[in-house]
């Protein structure tokens, strides 16, 4: 056992003495020590109930013959942090969470781990930490929230609430109507109900085989979710001492490939690209951004979920057969999935999904009737994004797939919000929000407030937006993020001027400004990136060490 180093031999009497103070008995020292990495926090709707899930997991681990040690990570609610400087801390929190996992697990030499994430950066943070620790690990999230309903039965979710702000700004709805949406959008505990970042990442945990079936879709606070929690706890005890299930044996290049296949089939959040590239770097898996476009050509988009389609939420995907049904349908086109990949369940991915059926073809489409013949994400390149930019094609209007418009430039999200509300953005424009990348922000804020304002003002099929920042999973429209290189590192996005013509072509995979090379060089000769004064010591360290979005915004280990 890895934990032998803290519990065996006469030299470890002091260590055992400390462990006895926590309640351990003689017979417990021969059992596997299992870390229970929880992320309980009261302020996040997807996490306030995880303390109870942690209790259930510890109960099951003890009953199955293991010794659980629960610890907690931090968490940030991206929705609550949205639209103010709190969002600067969201992406950096991923790195803190990874560091927490590594620190606790390696300091105490625990044998195995079960991770209980749910929302936004907590899932990828725990995945990164688990890769560093490399012990048998099972992921089991808190589960998705159910969709809300208005009095007339209309389904709503958090994206509805954000877009309602834009409608209220244009007096398209009353204060009373806004309040009804506000009170209905998030009806209870769970990760926000659409295919936003949290549910995208929890779904990809299934696709990578690090979680049991149902992890991404079984609603929170249900009997079915509790049973999944219990099964995961029993499973970690079964594999705790089996080196075949060391985390890097499960989360490898094949698992990353499968994650992107499911991402394409279900139209996941653009944040998944950022997080999966970080995971690939941590795993030392050779996975280039261009590979994503290759996968997209092979994978049909067969499940459209909010924000792409407001009538469908994760509970509907669960009822229609879940992730296994999506994967098995995609697998009908042989050679797309890496079916030999091992899962924490013990079977290969091919064995896991075999026999899974679509139970409602109105929710999960067949290969013969896809929403699109290609996947729901696209990486764009061009003189505006030499290292790439990300677009969620699954949630944009078809008429915007070829678009040329005039640049309206803002040097921060706050400037953009004021400009949009103030009427500066008009039909045919391309909103440019820069100096919001990993270094420029610092922290790479999500642009849900400006994108929601654009949608709420009925400009979603008339205006595009590009940024070196990123988007919420709830974002929809012609919104292109993660533009690399970013403005703060001298990227072309920083050289743009008001009125420049920007061309977007999804089919060709192009994002470019229509300028002569001589003009670009003239601007570059006199260009000096803006710098922001950062008061926070943590954000200063982050700004110093963070890489760009094309590399997953991971922290460098050398200056």
Curated annotation (Swiss-Prot):
Keywords: 2Fe-2S, Amino-acid biosynthesis, Branched-chain amino acid biosynthesis, Iron, Iron-sulfur, Lyase, Magnesium, Metal-binding. Pfam families: ILV_EDD_C, ILVD_EDD_N. Signal peptide: none annotated. Gene3D superfamilies: IlvD/EDD C-terminal domain-like. It catalyses: (2R)-2,3-dihydroxy-3-methylbutanoate = 3-methyl-2-oxobutanoate + H2O; (2R,3R)-2,3-dihydroxy-3-methylpentanoate = (S)-3-methyl-2-oxopentanoate + H2O. One of its GO terms (biological process) is isoleucine biosynthetic process. GO terms for cellular component: cytosol. Belongs to the IlvD/Edd family. This is Dihydroxy-acid dehydratase. It comes from Wolinella succinogenes (strain ATCC 29543 / DSM 1740 / CCUG 13145 / JCM 31913 / LMG 7466 / NCTC 11488 / FDC 602W) (Vibrio succinogenes). The lineage of its organism: Bacteria, Pseudomonadati, Campylobacterota, Epsilonproteobacteria, Campylobacterales.
């Amino acid at each position: 056992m890895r934990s032998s180093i803290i519990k065996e031999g006469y030299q470890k009497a002091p260590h055992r003495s400390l462990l006895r103070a926590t309640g351990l008995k003689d017979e417990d020292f021969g059992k596997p020590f299992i870390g229970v990495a929880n992320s309980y926090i009261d302020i996040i709707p997807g996490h306030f109930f995880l303390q109870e899930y942690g209790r259930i997991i510890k109960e099951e681990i003890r009953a199955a013959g293991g010794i659980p040690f629960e610890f907690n990570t931090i968490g940030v609610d991206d929705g609550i942090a949205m639209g103010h400087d709190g969002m600067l801390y969201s992406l950096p929190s991923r790195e803190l969470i990874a560091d927490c996992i590594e620190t606790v697990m390696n300091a105490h030499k625990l044998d195995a781990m079960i991770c209980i994430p749910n929302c936004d950066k907590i899932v990828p943070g725990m995945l990164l930490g688990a890769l560093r620790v490399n012990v048998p690990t099972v992921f089991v999230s808190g589960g998705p929230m159910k969709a809300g309903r208005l009095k007339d039965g209309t389904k709503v979710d958090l994206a509805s609430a954000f877009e309602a702000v834009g409608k209220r700004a244009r007096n398209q709805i009353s204060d009373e109507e806004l309040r009804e949406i506000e009170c209905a959008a998030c009806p209870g505990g769970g990760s926000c109900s659409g295919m936003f970042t949290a549910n995208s990442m929890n779904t990809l945990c299934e696709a990578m085989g690090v979680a049991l079936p149902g992890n991404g879709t079984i609603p929170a606070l249900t009997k079915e979710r509790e049973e999944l929690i219990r099964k995961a706890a029993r499973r970690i005890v079964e594999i705790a001492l089996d080196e075949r299930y060391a985390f890097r044996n499960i989360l490898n290049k094949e698992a990353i490939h499968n994650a992107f296949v499911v991402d394409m089939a279900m139209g996941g959040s653009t944040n998944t690209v950022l997080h999966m590239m970080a995971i690939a770097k941590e795993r030392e898996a050779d996975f280039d951004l261009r590979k994503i476009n290759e996968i997209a050509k092979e994978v049909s988009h067969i499940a459209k979920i909010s924000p792409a389609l407001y009538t469908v939420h994760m509970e509907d995907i669960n009822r229609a057969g879940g992730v296994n049904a999506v994967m098995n349908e995609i697998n009908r086109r042989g050679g797309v999935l890496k079916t030999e990949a091992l899962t924490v369940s013990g079977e290969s991915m091919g064995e896991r999904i075999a026999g899974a059926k679509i139970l409602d073809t109105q929710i999960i489409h067949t290969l013969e009737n896809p929403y699109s013949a290609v996947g729901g994400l696209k990486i764009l390149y061009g003189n505006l994004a030499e290292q790439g930019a990300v677009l969620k094609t699954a949630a944009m209007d078809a008429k915007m797939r070829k678009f040329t418009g005039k640049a309206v430039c803002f040097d921060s999200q706050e400037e953009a919000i004021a400009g949009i509300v103030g009427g500066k953005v008009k039909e045919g424009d391309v909103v440019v929000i820069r100096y919001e990348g990993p270094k420029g922000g610092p922290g790479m804020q999500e642009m849900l407030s400006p994108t929601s304002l654009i949608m709420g003002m009925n400009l979603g099929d008339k205006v595009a937006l590009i940024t070196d920042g990123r988007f919420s999973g709830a974002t929809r429209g012609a919104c292109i993020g993660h533009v690399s290189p970013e403005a703060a590192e001298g990227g072309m996005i920083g050289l743009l001027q008001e009125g420049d013509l920007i061309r977007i072509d999804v089919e060709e995979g192009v994002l470019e400004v229509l300028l002569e090379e001589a003009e670009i060089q003239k601007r570059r000769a006199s260009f000096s990136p803006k710098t922001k004064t950062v008061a926070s010591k943590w954000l200063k360290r982050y700004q110093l060490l963070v890489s760009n979005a094309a590399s997953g915004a991971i922290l460098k280990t050398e200056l």
